[in-house]
Amino acid sequence: PGSYMVQPEDRENGAAVDIILKGKRQMKRKYGVVDYLRKHYPPPEGSGEVEVEFLEGYDSIEGPDGSIGFGVFVPPEEKIYIADDLPGGEESMIETVAHEWKHWLQYCNDEAYDEEEAEDFAQQIVEEFL
């Protein structure tokens, strides 16, 4: 996806304002879900923080193990990477962030990564958040 260039005629009919507002709403949702997870699903006492980075211009991410997905949690960095241009829109983005958040919580609790548990958690967060 490229960037949208506002044309002079767009400024006249208010389209530029709509584009800017849409972008702000998406950003609020994107970071809002991270804030929501931090508040309602924190790690166990004594665990560090996890950083969540949205990779603009990417629709998928290759994990350290070579697998391709929309997001990945990298334990040594305690960092979650999310493809910012993933298909499926807002719901898919929220689901992906929550899925990787669950893997981080599993890591913090010294639990094995459980994909089914992460998927169930992601669905729960989508229902709670939207």
For each feature predicted by the language model, list its residue ranges.
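Auxiliary, metal-adjacent structural segments of Zn-dependent hydrolase domains
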Residues: 18-81, 130
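Post-HExxH zinc-binding segment in Zn-dependent metallohydrolases
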Residues: 111-130
